[in-house]
């Protein structure tokens, strides 16, 4: 095979090409880390192809809502923490993530946003940092979750400008409660600046959520959790989010936050708009014990993290485990479950033309997956960032 000096051609037993499987196929990656060809294997033309063995090549997973792992958190505001998270995620098939903050004093949020931007610019060793997700401080008390109310703030465009500035224009998403004063103006402002607004930690009614979505909001935060639920006389945040044809629906598929049957109901309503997330915090991949989530001290027992008052406080889910759960609970093909954690997150961020599926012209952010669903290799934009043959697997550590 003729190729450019730094191009590579990988052969796998199957390649998830777009949304369909291609048997015994090769993926050619150019020197820029972009996929230049996906085609059936030909012994003569692909004589130099790197044989990956009996694996499936699939798009890298994208965690669009994650706080931490391995004892580290975005709110640490350090490169070491973000890099540790990045390396850990790569071992589990995640090739990109959105670093998510929590409600905290303004100075701490500013520091976290600034560090996310710096680490994205400087680069990390594993999964790439796509940008920042501001989760809080624009919530309301009734469905606060693990967000301390003393640090809640009122919406003001000037403050939104401040967050954007501290993030060096790397702020991708903002979560807010649509019933707050000034919410619609804030949504319109953020939408005009290309920042995706998610609705959550909210007691808004159906009409308020409909108005927010009409104003430009793009989705709802971890569906069912931290929001007014679905009632036959009051459809609430859940009902509005599931019904709106363009609303992305975040879902934590760990079996603790949402019952599998409720996930099935949501999926039957929103279909491909369901976006698998982890909402994982620093206890992910760690033993049971005490940890911090923002300003809270929390306890993890058997992988479930709770506040002292008994509320859930983030998760210890991995995106790979979430995909497995969806595949099993909803009885959908593995490729369909996988795309809920790769293509749909990319689409929700408006980057589906770059990431989320394996197609010509997109980045070669991809993973080699064995028959037992373990990750063998992970590439980010054509660069090998994890190889199970030389590094320990991590999934066994994760709850």
UniProtKB/Swiss-Prot annotation:
Family: Belongs to the metallo-dependent hydrolases superfamily. NagA family.
CC cofactor note: Binds 2 divalent metal cations per subunit.
Family matches, as NCBIfam families: nagA (TIGR00221)
Domain of life: Bacteria
Role description: Involved in the first committed step in the biosynthesis of amino-sugar-nucleotides. Catalyzes the hydrolysis of the N-acetyl group of N-acetylglucosamine-6-phosphate (GlcNAc-6-P) to yield glucosamine 6-phosphate and acetate.
Metal-binding as UniProt keyword: yes
Alphabetic keyword roster: Carbohydrate metabolism, Hydrolase, Metal-binding
Subunit structure: Homodimer.
Keyword Cytoplasm: no
Pfam family, one: Amidohydro_1
Binding annotation for substrate: 146-147, 225-226, 233, 254-257, 312-314
Annotated InterPro entries: Amidohydro-rel, GlcNAc_6-P_deAcase, Metal-dep_hydrolase_composite, Metal_Hydrolase
Gene Ontology MF term list: iron ion binding; N-acetylglucosamine-6-phosphate deacetylase activity; protein homodimerization activity
Gene (name only): manD
Cofactor or coenzyme needed: a divalent metal cation
Biological processes per GO annotation: N-acetylglucosamine catabolic process; N-acetylneuraminate catabolic process
Binding of a divalent metal cation 1, residues: 65, 67, 135, 279
Cited Gene3D superfamilies: Metal-dependent hydrolases (3.20.20.140), Urease, subunit C, domain 1 (2.30.40.10)
Identification of the protein by name: N-acetylglucosamine-6-phosphate deacetylase
Active site: 279
Top class in the EC scheme: hydrolase
Pathway assigned in UniProt: Amino-sugar metabolism; N-acetylneuraminate degradation; D-fructose 6-phosphate from N-acetylneuraminate: step 4/5
Residues involved in a divalent metal cation 2 binding: 135, 201, 222
Organism: Vibrio furnissii
Reactions accelerated catalytically: N-acetyl-D-glucosamine 6-phosphate + H2O = D-glucosamine 6-phosphate + acetate
């Amino acid at each position: 095979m003729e190729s450019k000096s730094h191009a590579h051609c990988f052969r796998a037993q199957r390649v998830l090409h777009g949304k369909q499987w291609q048997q015994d196929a090769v993926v050619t990656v150019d020197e820029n880390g972009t996929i230049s060809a996906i085609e059936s294997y030909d012994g003569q033309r692909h004589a130099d192809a790197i044989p990956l063995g009996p694996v499936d090549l699939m798009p890298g997973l994208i965690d669009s809502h994650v706080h931490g792992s391995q004892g580290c958190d975005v709110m640490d505001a350090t490169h070491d923490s973000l890099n540790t998270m990045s390396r850990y995620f790569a071992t589990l098939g995640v090739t990109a993530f959105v670093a998510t903050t929590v409600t905290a004093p303004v100075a701490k949020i500013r520091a976290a946003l600034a560090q996310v931007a710096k680490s994205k610019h400087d680069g990390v060793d594993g999964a790439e940092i796509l940008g920042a997700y501001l989760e809080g401080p624009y919530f309301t008390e009734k469905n606060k979750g693990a967000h301390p109310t003393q640090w809640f703030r009122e919406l003001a465009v000037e403050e939104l400008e401040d967050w954007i500035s501290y993030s060096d224009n790397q702020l991708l998403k903002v979560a807010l409660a649509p019933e707050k004063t000034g919410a619609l103006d804030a949504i319109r402002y953020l939408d005009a600046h290309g920042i995706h607004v998610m609705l959550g930690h909210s007691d808004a009614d159906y009409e308020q959520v409909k108005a927010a979505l009409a104003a430009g909001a793009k989705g709802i935060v971890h569906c069912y959790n931290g929001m007014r639920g679905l009632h036959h006389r009051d459809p609430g945040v859940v009902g509005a989010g599931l019904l709106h044809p363009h609303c992305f629906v975040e879902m934590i598929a760990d079996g603790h936050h949402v019952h599998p049957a409720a996930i099935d109901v949501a999926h039957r309503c929103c279909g491909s708009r369901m976006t698998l997330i982890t909402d994982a915090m620093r206890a992910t991949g760690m033993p049971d014990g005490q940890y911090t989530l923002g300003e809270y001290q929390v306890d993890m027992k058997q992988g479930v993290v709770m506040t002292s008052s008994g509320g859930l406080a983030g998760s210890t889910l991995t995106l790979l485990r979430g995909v497995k759960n969806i595949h099993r609970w909803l009885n959908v093909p593995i490729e369909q479950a996988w795309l809920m954690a790769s293509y749909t997150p990319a689409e929700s961020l408006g980057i589906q033309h770059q990431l989320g599926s394996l197609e010509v012209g997109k980045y070669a952010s991809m993973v080699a997956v064995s028959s037992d669903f373990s990750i063998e290799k992970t590439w980010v934009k054509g660069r090998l960032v994890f190889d199970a043959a030389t590094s320990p697997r991590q999934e066994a550590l994760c709850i």
